[in-house]
Amino acid sequence: MMVKLLLLFLVCWSALPLESSPLGNRYNLEIGEKQYYISLAKTNWFEASNHCRQNGGFLLNLESREELELLSPHLHPAYSYWLSINDLGERGVYVSEATGLEAPFLNWSAGEPDNSSGYDRCVELWLSTTSFQMNDLPCYSSVAFICQLN
């Protein structure tokens, strides 16, 4: 009986894709040449960016629709995720914090960016109807995040 319980425990434990990190659980992922980890811990944009940098990466810098489509099936629909994009330097000019250059790919939800709070300066990826799209949000909001490691 004890052996069966031990085997059951090992099977269940090995099926879990999440690893522990200071900000909660994360899911490691490799797509092509790129490595990501998806953290389900909710935090503000600044803490998320710092966490990625401390782990040798940066917040996700989406470069194309193709990259978004490859990544989307791995994202939980109940979560939204910080990206590296913000307009903290100049309102309306969306720059990737990862590169310091204008964001190479923007896929806004209908009506976005709208700066609805008056402080929407950072960009999240969220499920808008049937696909993940971008939304501007106050940087101190707490959402999950995606780090890119290379």
From Swiss-Prot:
Residues 31-148 form the C-type lectin domain. The keyword Ribosomal protein does not apply. It comes from Drosophila melanogaster (Fruit fly). Residues 1-20 form the signal peptide. This is C-type lectin 37Db. Its main location: secreted. Disulfide bonds join 52-147, 122-139. Glycans are attached at residues 107, 115. GO terms for biological process: calcium-dependent cell-cell adhesion via plasma membrane cell adhesion molecules; encapsulation of foreign target; immune response; melanization defense response. SMART domains: CLECT. It comes from the Eukaryota. GO terms for cellular component: external side of plasma membrane; extracellular region. It is found in: Secreted. Keywords: Calcium, Disulfide bond, Glycoprotein, Hemagglutinin, Lectin, Metal-binding, Secreted, Signal. The keyword Transmembrane helix does not apply. GO terms for molecular function: carbohydrate binding; galactose binding; metal ion binding; pattern recognition receptor activity. Galactose-specific lectin that displays calcium-dependent activity. Binds to the surface of hemocytes and enhances hemocyte encapsulation and melanization. This is likely by interacting with carbohydrates on the surface of the hemocytes. Also displays agglutination activity against the Gram-negative bacterium E.coli. PANTHER family: MANNOSE, PHOSPHOLIPASE, LECTIN RECEPTOR RELATED. Pfam families: Lectin_C (PF00059).
